[in-house]
Amino acid sequence: MISPTNLLPARKITPVSNGGAATASPSSPSVAARPRRLPSGLQSVTGRGKVSLAAITLDDYLPMRSTEVKNRTSTDDITRLRLITAVKTPYLPDGRFDLEAYDSLINMQIEGGAEGVIVGGTTGEGHLMSWDEHIMLIGHTVNCFGSRIKVIGNTGSNSTREAVHATEQGFAVGMHAALHINPYYGKTSAEGMISHFEAVLPMGPTIIYNVPSRSAQDIPPEVILAISGYTNMAGVKECVGHERVKHYADKGITIWSGNDDECHDSKWKHGATGVISVTSNLVPGLMHSLMYKGENATLNEKLSPLMKWLFCQPNPIALNTALAQLGVARPVFRLPYVPLPLEKRAEFVRIVESIGRENFVGQKEARVLDDDDFVLISRY
């Protein structure tokens, strides 16, 4: 049980005999006492044969103390999820959230078999939201759907301070788990990544997100192994590929594929638990079948053109275009995103016809929208 009076204790660094490495001895029962596994190459940076972590101080004071909040969902509950949708955020013409369209989309995910949603992730454009908007949307999702689907808030940041504050707030409004990326743009060392994740792990179930194409820095396996013993470490959304998925699965670490076009083989051939999916926004039922009904190369091949189309430009450009063409969301884009060109919109209609309109979300026929149908918002 997490101590309500000492959520993030300062670590005591003591030398051990295994080659001069240091161990972190937390004084809180929220983190199991165990030797700290440091990345190779970091064993002798002080010149005294052990790592000095004297400059790392974890704050003792955090405003969210409730053990009731923290124990709402167990980490095991999260590790069992096979289909998690990285859900899109729809907008009104003035740039505000279209909560009616959002609620409808979440209902479609639940009806299609999705077991969890990532709120405010890359696909949901969390990076285009203020933190007030972000936490409001997490809280809204929990309040409306939290008893029917797991709500995983993207509260990660390249700033540890912001990640800590947002994660506190996310769990305070009821999210079941947090998604955390490694510090991007400014980047950090492997040891810095470990300390960054350790600052948020005591708060509740956590999924680590590795997407080097966006963060510009791979999370090396030794970092994941170093934090894998934490009670709240649910697993990794991994975008590097099958070899990395298998590496973690063989070590008993829960892995979700972050690549829709690889998720079938990652699940059935390489040991992934499931997928955190963009495609399931459009065809949740088919993605549920892909994750639950055994190896199915035919279905995977059937979905391949859609998956390829969805990532023809940086996500979520194509998804936003598709949901507008299906009439599920208004054709409103927060800049810098703009819709796909006309020929790609026409291609999507053909893909819908090929897969079958009945497999897609919404009730309206897919149609090719004109350029003038779209609204681009720069102030929101």
Swiss-Prot record:
One of its GO terms (molecular function) is 4-hydroxy-tetrahydrodipicolinate synthase activity. Residues 1-44 are annotated as: Disordered. Gene3D superfamilies: Aldolase class I (3.20.20.70). Pyruvate binds at T123, I276. Residues 1-54 form a transit peptide. Sensitive to lysine inhibition. This inhibition increase in an allosteric manner with increasing concentration of the inhibitor. It is an enzyme of class 4 (lyase). This is 4-hydroxy-tetrahydrodipicolinate synthase, chloroplastic.
